[in-house]
Amino acid sequence: MRVKANSKILALIVPVLLSLNSLVCANPVQEDMSAHESLPAAAAPAEVHAPVEVHNAAGTHVETAHESAVEGHEEKAGDVIMHHVQDSNVLAFEPFGEIELPHLQLGSLDISITKHVVMMWVAAVILILVGAAAGAGVKKISVKQAPSGIANVMEALVDFIRLDVAKSNIGHGYEKHLPYLISVFFFILVCNLLGLIPYGATATGNINVTLALSIFTFFITQIAAFKELGVGGYVKHLTAGTHWSLWIIMIPIEIIGQFTKPVALTIRLFANMTAGHIIILSLIFISFILESYIVAAAVSVPFAIFIYLLEIFVAFLQAFVFTMLSALFIGLATAHESHDSHELEASGHH
């Protein structure tokens, strides 16, 4: 049992250590130190430290060499953090090198392949392989047998989305929207987790990706509402059952509300996935900025590992929240007043 526990702990810590190794290899502070050591001896007299005093005769503050060096390290650490979070046309595999992705131009439209596009392709391939493996595992067992392994995990997640997300929020006719909800849940989940492995990137930390997913939810919601309610029912739904004298107020408010929902979905997923990575990298770079192994051992690494484990939970949580809100928006848009009243009457009779 102790060996199994140790192996589980190593399985959690090794990816973090690999990520730290890649960051150390790209550490700008070490590059500055090596460049300083490689200067010729003749240039040494030019490196004169600023005076120890922090105030001159007039009483104004004089910036010391140490302060300027720390500020320079902070700026370069910030550049590295933003480079990791932002999208780019380069796949970096420090210390092994990098891969330049092709630049594609369609007229004035830039359709270049970026690292976030590659991560979405990887997520799609992973989902296809995992889905095929789970399907093969289910086919091999009989009706009386329970699935095991990856098939058991996938069945549990799919049943959770089907019953607790789709059916409970959409109600009648939820089966039509179940494929989209399952697909968007697993796609967001895998994209979130890919950003936590070495050399990976979080595609859902790109606001363009989250906006595209939110637009899918918006159009599916509106199309489902028109099909379910019709044009007259859709307009009546916008008035929210109010008196006609209030329509001039209610209709614009409801129309604005239809567009603010995808905006909320976009910003919520983007902000949560970006913030976690910035916090992890900021904690790691504290030791580099202060140039202290004590700080790294006592603060940076332990807190970074804690946030890393928390981000695994956040990856599942944000995939669930996006899927839940998508199902909720679809359910609100397609709700029938007659169905609701019949359900209330039926519950009252029971």
UniProtKB/Swiss-Prot annotation:
It holds the Pfam family ATP-synt_A. CDD domains: ATP-synt_Fo_a_6. GO terms for molecular function: proton-transporting ATP synthase activity, rotational mechanism. Gene3D superfamilies: ATP synthase, F0 complex, subunit A. The chain crosses the membrane at residues 117-137, 178-198, 206-226, 247-267, 269-289, 294-314, 315-335. One of its GO terms (cellular component) is plasma membrane. Keywords: ATP synthesis, Cell inner membrane, Cell membrane, CF(0), Hydrogen ion transport, Ion transport, Membrane, Signal, Transmembrane, Transmembrane helix, Transport. The keyword Cell inner membrane applies. It comes from the Bacteria. Residues 1-26 form the signal peptide. Disulfide bonds: none annotated. InterPro entries: ATP_synth_F0_asu, ATP_synth_F0_asu_AS, ATP_synth_F0_asu_bact/mt, F0_ATP_A_sf. It is found in: Cell inner membrane. It is a multi-pass membrane protein. Its main location: membrane. SUPFAM superfamilies: F1F0 ATP synthase subunit A. Belongs to the ATPase A chain family. NCBIfam families: ATP_synt_6_or_A, PRK13419.1. Key component of the proton channel; it plays a direct role in the translocation of protons across the membrane. F-type ATPases have 2 components, CF(1) - the catalytic core - and CF(0) - the membrane proton channel. CF(1) has five subunits: alpha(3), beta(3), gamma(1), delta(1), epsilon(1). CF(0) has four main subunits: a, b, b' and c. This is ATP synthase subunit a 2.
